[in-house]
Each structure stands twice: as C-alpha cells, then as structure tokens.
Amino acid sequence: MKSITTLLPLALAIASTQAYCPPTGPVLPPPTLPACPSNLTSTTRRALEKISSSTDATFSVQVTSRNHTFFSHHHTGTTLADIGTAEVDGESVYRLASVTKVFTVLSLLLQEGVDLDLPASHYVAELDNVPGYESTTLRMLASQLAGVPRDGYMFDLTSGLSPEMLKSLGLPSIEPPANVPKCDAVSQGQAPCTRSEFFDVLAGAGTTWQPGQKAAYSNLAFIILGFAVENITGTPYVEVVRDTILEPLGMTSTGYSAPELSRLVVPNNSRDFAVMDVYNYNATGGLYSTPNDLSSFLRGLLNFDLLNNARTSAWLKPQAFTSSPLNSVGAPWEIYRPTSLLPDNRPLDVYTKSGGLPGYNAYIALVPEFDIGISVNVAGAGDKDYDVVRAIFSSVLETLVPGLDALARTQAAQKYAGTYTSGSGNTTSSLVMSVDDGPGLKVEKWTLLGNNVLDIVAMLNRAQGAAAIDVRAYPIGEDERWLLVTEKVGGDQGAPAVYAGTCDGWFLLDQVRFAGLPTDEIDFVVKDGEVVGAVSPGLRQQLTKS
C-alpha cells in the first residue's frame, strides 16, 4: 500500500469547483464521418430550409471534415440582380469581406523570421511618423489590440451623406480638416489613398484605445498589415496570398479581382460593389471566393497543411477578453464558447471570422472538438444581413453539434470502453472504462495488484471513498495517449466566491512522476485499428482488453 500512496499524491488531484473541468479542446477523439451522413445532417437541412422560406436573401452553407465536405446547402433568393449567376452552388463566387483578415494574418505567419512582437515600425517604417504607434506590434494589429481607428475616411459621414442629409440629422455644416486627404472612400467614387496619404490620415486620426489595452475592431489595422507583408516579402500583397495560401491549397476560384459575371453572386442593391476594387482595403476585406474553395481552405487548416499543429494551435488562442466569458478576440479570430450545445453544458470552443460589405456577409469557423470547418456566404439580405448570417450560422451549430457529440461518444464507446486486465488472484490488475453523458472516458474501476487505486486517490484528496470522486481520461491528440483528471462528484460547493465555477486542472497535470514516468497517463494499444490493451506508464501496468 505504501508504494502506491507515494505514486499517486496529487497526480490525480481534485481540480475543479464545478461539475466537470476537462481540459479545453476535444474530450474524445473527433468522430469519423461518412461521405453523406444524412442521419446526422437532416435536422440541419430542415433548419436551413425553414430560414430559406423566411428570407429573400441568397446563401450557401458548407461543412467539411478533415477529409471531405459532408454537408452543402444552397438557396437562391429573390434579391439577385439580372446579371451574374442565376442559381448558386458550390462554385458560385461571393465577396468574403472581412473573412479576408484571416488570410492576411496567415500570410504573415508563413513568412520566415517575422517577429510579431517587434514594433510594427520595424516592418512599416511610416509608423515612425505616426504619433502613438511607438509600441504597437504586428500582433496587436492582428489581434485588434492596437487602438487603430476603424475605417478612416472610407465611411466618414461626410463622404457618404449629402450636406442636406447631414443637416437633417442635426449635424453642423462643416468640411473635414484641410490636411485630411479625401481618398479611399472608393464606394463614393474617390481615388484610393497613396501610402503617403494613408499615413497622413492615420497621423491625424488619433487612437481608439491605447495600444495593447483593449480590443477595438479596426479595418485600417489590416491595411497596415498588408503593407507589412509587402515590405517583408518585396512582393505585392495579393501575390503573396496567392503564392503562399491559394495555390498550395488549390483555391483556384479565390482572388482579389471580380470573376466573370456568370459565376458572380450579384445582389440587386449592390451591383457596383459586387465588382468594385477596394484597393488598400484588399488586406482587410478584398477577397472573392466560392463555398468549395472555402472548404478547401478550412481543410488545409484542419490538416495543418500550411502551419504545423503547434503553430496552428497557438494561432487560435485568444489574445484579448471581452466583457463576456463566452467570447474573446483572437488574431483575428472571433472566438465563441457557447455552453448550451453539449449535454454536459461545458463550453464548446468555436473559432470564427465574420465579414460584411454592402450586399454581402460571410462566416468561416473551425470547431476543433469535432474536427470540422463551416462556411456561410450570404448575399442580398438587405437591412437584416447581420441577423440573417448569424441565424444561419447558429442554426448549423445548434443542429449539428448534438449529433456530432453523440457520434463521437458512440465511436469512443465502441473503441475504448470495456475491461482491461492482467494477472490473477492477489496479483490481479484491472481497469474498467466507459462512456457516459460526461466528458471523456470515465474510469469505473481501477486496481493494481488487488488494491483499489480509486480508493487511494479519494483518500489522498480527502474524499469519502471512490464514490465521491470522478476520474476521467482525455485524449492528448497523438499516439493514443490520454491524461487523467480527478474531480469531486458534484463539484466543490463550498468554494470561496472568487473561485466558484473555476477550473484549476491545468495546475495539476503531470504533477507526479514515478521513476521518470507520469502517473496520470493512460496509453491505449491499437492493432489493426482495434484497441487491444492499455498501459499505465507510471504504475508500470500493461493490461489486455477483454
């Protein structure tokens, strides 16, 4: 008994003040999806058909796994112009608007030797002459933390509204300062700013927040990032994106110029904007693409075709909080953590980027829990565009996630659940694993040389026996290695207010090793795709599945 108690102190320590505190990310291996899982997607299709019947907008939705697009839905509304495509499908071209920002950041990440935490002026020398930007970094720009004004003169009221309209709104009749270049409002027929003019505008615009302080959405920040890409590579920004992202991923219908009209989705109220070159705004919102190409892009991210696993994972991490614990800001991800989609009410990490231009809305999303990517393109939704694209995206998640979660549980139960044993009599060791409504694999029973390991874990954590604790295994994501986390059944109801609802399991992982090996790890042995055994490295157990 003594040897076991020295192996396990705190290695499986109680880690939560709520019911479940699994590590973030997938709690079971993502499910393997068939090519056409109609039983999984039928509810999603019905939900989108209901939206189709209530909107005049045109939209396309695709959902892809790492291997293939397993769901597509296209609806041709009544607000398309008589030019452009007459019926949308996977090869129809939409404007992506600010979804472009993901491509801009990725094009920077793909450059060797770029330090995102150096002052941005190291890569864009003009910033030396812009007050307030001395400490601004590329990472701040990419994460909406630089305090850069949102839009400059492009959407200034004086550029888009007549003097009569401004007067009717009660605004004074004034002209912008003489030193503010009237450029880049291309939708109003103005010429694009030169680089010199752009930085003149920036120098006179001040900042929204102090750099590094708080998130504030900015399109101008990504124009600066586009300039940085050009300076770093010595190549025009649009060519860098083409050479480093579009061509490697086979995105042949994606680019910064309007395609032939027969493929372009053209809303009736946005005919001019459909084909408009946005010049400096290319790096913030200039891309055109198809649903099929977006699925190729999302598969490229899921398969780490451009960035490896470690760098992709780091890229997805939050960079700034919002005032809600359910969403945060990345580079440039808009990260949501809904708690209502999974049966155990734990947060589901959803990494999104939205976009909107007159007549167009777009969404892309990665859901690592299930290894899927989602794209939504909307055209011609009018004043309700924001509501429509969010309703579509939310409907896809709400209807797909329960089925994906159930499939992941079913497949995990078939593969891992069961009894693992070795020895006999007093030397018997065993491990019983199951899949229930909670996260991960539940450890139902665990013995070592006839001793109840779970009783020992409970004793070390001042719990009243094995029934008072819950031990679960979670996948590390490689080589069938899993980590164990122990929690009190029902959570810690007596936690002080500051710690109520928090999760501290990350403090305790791999805390105790025995003779160099972890005591909180279980490795499954797989042969010909079937699990045939389990190994506890720290306890030196080698068990065979019954």
Give residue spans per PLM region.
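Stable alpha-helical elements in mature extracytoplasmic
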Residues: L40-A47, F70, V99-T100, L116-Y123, ...
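Alpha-helical scaffold elements that line and support the substrate/ligand-binding pocket
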Residues: V61, N67-H68, R95-P119, L141, ...
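Core domains of carbohydrate- and sulfate-ester-processing enzymes
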Residues: G152, D156-C193
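The feature captures the short pre-catalytic strand/loop hairpin that immediately precedes
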Residues: D82-I83, S196-T208, V266-Y279, D344-N345
